[in-house]
């Protein structure tokens, strides 16, 4: 599948930027969507557009204006996201809504705008980057786990509705070495329990030992290249291959015990 025009959310850093670079290297015209496009410089075929995905009204306006100004893309990658690390009793109310908007509502709205147009043009792929956290939730990140799980379920629902020219990919990505943890809103350290501190150290360890964003971007591109709908696991060998298999044979209570032991 030749990708002429692509939209990538969260395309100024980490996995999003790596996806943009992968597409640009293959001759695709790329539109990177982010809150702070000034972080990087535009260049030939690389367009930087400003959008706050927590503002649902702005997301709807963006969908309409993009179609009018640039036309229908061949590829939409809903990559933008972040995790917030809090005990549930301390989780800020505004952060709850913001995470739902960024992780779930905005990707769904963008799909609503672009999927019908892709069908009309007879080709298109939508990649929704979910997470291995749909199977193995992260402690103290309940809204991240919930948002990614819901996005995964939404993508699978779209696979039921669409066939033929429009492809849907639920890409469940494991840990990738990015600045994800550095940018995460966190409960102030002096109020964190000992169990929170230990969980955060384990999450940091996993991230630091993970594959690069460039590695993940290549996996994502290869999934697009297959031109098929489906659920795909990405990341290092254990998380992409063994963890999904292990999950199939693990009872729910057993899973909770394993996760509590890992993050204790």
Could you tell me what each predicted segment is?
Residues 44-57:
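Rossmann-fold cofactor-recognition segment
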Residues 12-13:
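Conserved glycine-rich cofactor-binding loop
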Residues 131:
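Residue(s) in the substrate-gating loop at a strand-loop-helix junction
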Residues 111, 147-150:
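Active-site helix of classical SDR
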Residues 79-84:
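Conserved NAD(P)H cofactor-binding loop of Rossmann-fold oxidoreductase domains
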Residues 87-88, 95-100:
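Substrate-binding pocket helix/loop in short-chain dehydrogenase/reductase
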Residues 160-231:
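SDR active-site lid
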């Amino acid at each position: 599948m030749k990708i002429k025009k692509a939209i990538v959310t969260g395309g100024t850093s980490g996995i999003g930027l790596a996806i943009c670079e992968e597409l640009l290297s293959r001759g695709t015209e790329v539109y990177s969507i982010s809150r702070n496009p000034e972080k990087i410089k535009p260049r030939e075929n690389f367009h930087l557009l400003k959008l706050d995905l927590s503002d649902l009204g702005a997301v709807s306006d963006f969908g309409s204006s993009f179609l009018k100004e640039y036309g229908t893309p061949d590829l939409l990658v809903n990559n933008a996201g972040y995790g917030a690390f809090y005990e549930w009793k301390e989780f800020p109310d505004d952060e709850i809504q913001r995470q739902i908007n960024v992780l779930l509502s905005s990707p769904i709205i963008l799909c609503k705008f672009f999927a019908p147009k892709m069908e009309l043009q007879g080709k298109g792929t939508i990649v929704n980057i979910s997470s291995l956290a749909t199977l193995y939730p992260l402690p103290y990140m309940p809204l991240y786990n919930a948002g990614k799980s819901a996005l995964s379920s939404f993508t699978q629902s779209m696979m039921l509705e669409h066939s033929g020219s429009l492809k849907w990919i639920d890409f469940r990505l494991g840990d990738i070495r990015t600045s994800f943890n550095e940018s995460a809103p966190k409960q102030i350290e002096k109020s964190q329990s000992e169990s929170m501190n230990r969980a955060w150290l384990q999450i940091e360890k996993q991230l630091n030992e993970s594959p690069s964003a460039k590695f993940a971007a290549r996996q994502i591109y290869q999934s697009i290249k297959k031109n098929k709908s489906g659920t795909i696991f990405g990341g290092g060998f254990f998380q992409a291959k063994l963890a999904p298999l292990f999950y199939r044979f693990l009872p729910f209570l057993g899973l909770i015990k394993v996760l509590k032991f890992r993050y204790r």
